[in-house]
Amino acid sequence: LLMPSKGLLFNRSDKSRTYRANLFSDNNVLAIINLSVYRKFLFDHASGPAAAIIYTPKREDINQPIVYCTPKPIYTIEDIRKFSIDPTDICRIPRDIIDDDRIWKIAMWGAPRDLELIGKMQSTFAPMASFIEENHMITAEGFKRGNRKHQCCDFEGLPLVEAKSFKPYYISSDELPTVDFDDFECIVKNAREIFNAPHLIIKQSHKNGRFLSEVLDYDAVFNHSLLGIHGEIEQLKYLSVIIGSRIFSYYHILTNRRWLVERDELEAGDIWQTPIPKPNNGELAEACNIFDKLVNSPKENHLLEQFARNMYRLKEYECYQIDDVIDYVYDYFKNKRRSVSFSRPSIDSYKLYYASVKGVLTRTFGTGAGFSGDLYVGDAPLSVLVLNVEHPTTKDLNVITNNDQLNEILLNLDRSLVDNQQMVFARRNLRIYQREKIFIVKPAQRKYWTYSAACRDADEIFEDISKAWR
């Protein structure tokens, strides 16, 4: 069955939830192939992204997980005649969590640990809508000109904030045009306060993966592509700092039903559902101080990032997860074949991967287990990390580079790991288990040697070993 992926996987309306529930209860769904990223390659004239479902009518309950595959282009000549499947494009969704609306988007771009982090954020912090209600704020989208059937002179001469020239944090009224028209479709009759100072104005589309907002201390109007919030200026500045953080972008990359599926903007309802920590007076003052500095230096956002991560009480490994999604997932979506995801890793990247996979395995198996590592890298398309199982050790990663014989071996191995069927280009990563060694063989591309990749590989190694012990 081929159908729109948005309705099947990402919409959260009651109608869509009922359809998904009936689909899974009335049939044995074996696999779902989410073709959203391939929309432009496979369906030139499609009005929306598609998904394919492989299923049989239900005769008896089955317990095996649903295979969920999200193939993604590799932006080479192979994309013209085939579609590509990477090992990270395939996951197995346990049937006891298929009713979780979040799983399909997170599994599309993230990893199991991202589901944990998103769940932690949602369970720990109330949505922005609650923050807005508790602080008696007023929200709405701006006016809409549309069919221009209604005449209204209320906005004439007021500063006009426009999405196309939106400036983050603050813009002087002298820099803005003024309203010189009086024809509208919608004039925001019931929430006019959003145009009154002080107000926070949020741009619903992002710029380079970040969402922009500004707090103005003068009255101004704007159209429906911008959101307005009227309230106390300290709380508005706090929200602006949170909205500008990588955490805000990370959350919506992995939960929003439109972004990285078909459109590059958020709907108002999605923004209001963002988990927001409740600040105390000291934290409000700190946010205002950071905001005021950003007005003069909008690119100096390291203080903003540190503040936001402290507010969300993130641990170091959770910060790595967030950075990986922005630096690699979003960068892949934006820059395609020019993405840093496809570039060769630095030795420091390999060392971070090694330290991370070693740390996860040591914590999982206990402090009695120790690992050292040998890394084989060269000019070949593959890199090999050998984990030596031994007593606890503080040895650094041993790096072996540019051996002609090694390069030849890795080139031949790379060819053997590609399943080159007529219409499918599938690549397999390789793990080999020996009594005292674990071989991890993967392409020499940065996306395979990140912190998040290390956590995923370590979890799968533990699962493989646990199955062997049974």
Annotate each predicted stretch with a short phrase.
Residues 8-12, 39-42, 62, 167-170, ...:
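Flexible loop/turn segments at secondary-structure boundaries
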Residues 1-147, 221-226, 264-272:
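Signature of N6-adenine DNA methyltransferases within the class I
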Residues 63-64, 169-172, 210-214, 237-239, ...:
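Short helix/loop capping segments that flank catalytic or ligand/cofactor-binding pockets
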Residues 3, 100-144, 156-157, 164, ...:
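Non-catalytic DNA-recognition/assembly elements of restriction-modification systems
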Residues 100-228, 232:
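Polyanion-binding catalytic cores of nucleic-acid enzymes and NTP/SAM-utilizing transferases
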Residues 3-4, 11-14, 18, 24-27, ...:
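Generic recognition of stable, solvent-exposed alpha-helical segments in well-folded globular domains
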Residues 60-62, 193, 224-273, 280-286, ...:
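Basic, amphipathic alpha-helical recognition segments used for DNA target recognition
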Residues 12-15, 172, 253-255:
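Short, solvent-exposed loop/turn and secondary-structure capping segments
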